[in-house]
């Protein structure tokens, strides 16, 4: 038997009437009330046990969780969820996009869920501030755009992360990087090289930054700086996580990435990790890298290593009018290694290049490719002519080895 939206809403109102609003009730207490009411309703309507259980789950999620989104959030194989108004919900599973058969019962219910998401992280979203980035309790990143900025209805984009963050061994197993290249990066991190990770949307930058951070020695003091906290550093006891704050209509001032970088440098860090450079804070990141904070890590959106350098120049100019040669000199002296990630046609994510910034000459930054991902089709008129050979190959050697030598590491085999 199919229960109508109207009947579900009435049942929900009966359950709400039973909830004691004078105190905070636990999930167990709420679930018990839901179960009791659904049991009575199920007997009256001759529901099958499976139908009653599905109804209980739906009502509990609508009261205590994130309504129809909760089932998608609980599925470990789903990586992204997109809500386009109350009627349309899409999700990405195993690299493919699907439309959900679920929808919100009304625009009001969608807005209730939006307020719940924003409020859980002390963020405010309303007509005065209709766009907000936030995160869920499980670490998922959320972007919200309210109607009428989102013309066809309020939009939500959720990027999920695994409960247990990927370590480099996972990425090797998924063939995102070779064991040899991963070992090379491990030595670079241990030696205190400043590393910048670039890639397009969904290329795995945050995941890779997590994996790189795994190599940081346990005893070092690490400060992470993010718009919305996403990094999940494992077994790092001396870790301080900083997160930006938006301004609101009550006069609370914003706290920006730039503010947090300046604060972090006064906190005696061994390493500063900036989740993503998007604007004028790029200048502060470069200055941190150039003032003795070796081993710093960050990421940025770009289509290649060269494109990342151009974008960094533009971002620095957002914060201060500096001559281009001065900016390029800062980049060349601050960043040691560029790692570029990409998403392939088969939806897999790969490390496409590991490149050293080798120097700065005649107003140009000199790049030295060390590893590069190659994709070659087999020769025609052979048995394997439709086969594509894909592998990461070593194409050069590290030029600047001073940090590695000071840290006591040998280049043999790297």
Task: Say what each PLM segment does.
Residues 1-125, 136:
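N-terminal accessory targeting/assembly segments
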Residues 75, 88, 92-191:
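P-loop NTP-binding catalytic core
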Residues 193-195, 211-334, 340-342:
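Switch/coupling sub-region of P-loop NTPases
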Residues 199:
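The Walker A (P-loop) glycine that initiates the GxxxxGKT/S ATP-binding motif of P-loop NTPases
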Residues 202:
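Walker A (P-loop) phosphate-binding loop of P-loop NTPases
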Residues 205:
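Conserved lysine of the Walker
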Residues 208:
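Hydrophobic positions on the alpha1 helix immediately C-terminal to the Walker A/P-loop
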Residues 347-414:
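NTP-binding/hydrolysis catalytic cores, primarily Walker-type P-loop NTPases
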């Amino acid at each position: 038997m199919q229960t109508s939206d109207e009947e579900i809403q009435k049942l929900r109102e009966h359950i709400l009437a039973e909830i004691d609003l004078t105190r905070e009730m636990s999930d167990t207490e709420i679930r018990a009330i839901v179960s009791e009411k659904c049991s009575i309703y199920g007997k009256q309507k001759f529901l099958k046990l499976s139908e009653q259980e599905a109804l209980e789950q739906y009502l509990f999620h609508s009261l205590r969780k994130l309504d129809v989104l909760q089932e998608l959030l609980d599925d470990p194989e789903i990586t992204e969820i997109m809500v386009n108004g109350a009627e349309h919900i899409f999700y990405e599973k195993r690299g493919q996009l699907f439309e959900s058969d679920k929808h919100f019962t009304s625009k009001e219910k969608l807005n209730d869920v939006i307020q719940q998401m924003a409020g859980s992280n002390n963020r405010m979203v309303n007509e005065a501030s209709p766009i907000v980035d936030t995160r869920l309790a499980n670490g998922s990143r959320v972007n919200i755009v309210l109607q009428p900025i989102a013309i066809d209805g309020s939009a939500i984009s959720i990027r999920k992360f695994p409960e247990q963050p990927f370590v480099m061994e996972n990425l090797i197993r998924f063939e995102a990087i070779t064991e040899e290249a991963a070992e090379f990066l491990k030595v670079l991190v241990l030696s205190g090289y400043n590393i910048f990770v670039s890639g397009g949307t969904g290329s795995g930058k945050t995941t890779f930054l997590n994996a790189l951070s795994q190599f940081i020695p346990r005893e070092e003091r690490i400060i992470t700086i993010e718009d919305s906290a996403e990094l999940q550093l494992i077994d790092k006891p001396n870790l301080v996580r900083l997160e930006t704050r938006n301004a609101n209509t009550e006069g609370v001032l914003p706290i920006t990435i730039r503010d947090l970088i300046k604060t972090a440098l006064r906190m005696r860090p061994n390493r500063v990790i900036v989740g993503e450079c998007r604007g004028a804070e790029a200048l502060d990141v470069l200055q941190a890298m150039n003032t003795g904070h070796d081993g710093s890590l960050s990421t940025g959106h770009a289509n290649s290593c060269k494109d990342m350098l151009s974008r960094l120049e533009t971002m620095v100019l957002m914060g201060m009018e500096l001559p281009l040669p001065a900016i390029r000199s800062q980049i060349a002296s601050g960043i040691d290694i560029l790692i570029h990630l990409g998403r392939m046609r088969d939806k897999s994510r790969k490390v496409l290049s590991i490149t050293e910034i080798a120097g700065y000459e005649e107003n140009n930054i000199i790049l030295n490719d060390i590893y590069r991902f190659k994709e070659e089709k087999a020769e025609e008129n052979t048995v394997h002519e439709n086969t594509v050979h894909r592998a990461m190959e070593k194409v050069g050697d590290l030029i600047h080895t001073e940090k590695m030598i000071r840290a006591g590491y040998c280049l043999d085999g790297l």
